[in-house]
Amino acid sequence: MAGYSGSPLTRKLGIGEGATVALLDLPAALEPELGTVSVLPSGVRVRRRAGGTADVVVAFVTAAARLERRIGPLGAMVFPAGGLWIAWPKRASSLVTDLTDHVVREVALPRGLVDNKVCAVDDDWTALRLVWRVEHRGGTAPLDPVR
């Protein structure tokens, strides 16, 4: 599905040739658009578990408490220059969530991550792209500077 913009979802998420991508808790409905080799750019390596490093991480989350627990390890996966997409159900979706863009920012910003893009994934999911602030990119990833 090209979504609202007409662009392929892989392009909207910044998944380019040769990238390492982690798709975490990918909903079954999105498998045809992200989870199959035929739709991905050439040479993309896909992982389904957290850990290690990745150029792009797309994490589907429905609970703020779970995001709080996972934001540190997820941020470390994309340090220093990758992109972390946090996807959550839209308000109009039938999926239950306590997440909004405001909650994602409240969790991410104090830890050194800043949002720079938003993506309408499909009719049920929206996502915010987080990257490390420029001043954090030169050293080591802050493990969890707020808590």
Which stretches of residues belong to each language-model region?
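Mid-chain, well-packed structural core segment of small domains
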Residues: 68-99
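Short acidic/glycine-enriched loop/turn segments that link adjacent beta-strands
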Residues: 122-126
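Short, glycine-rich nucleotide/cofactor-binding loops
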Residues: 57-67
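Short acidic low-complexity segments
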Residues: 42-54
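N-terminal, charge-rich interaction modules
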Residues: 1-37, 41-43
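Conserved Class I S-adenosyl-L-methionine
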Residues: 98-119
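Flexible, glycine-/basic-rich loop-and-beta segments that form/coincide
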Residues: 9, 134-147
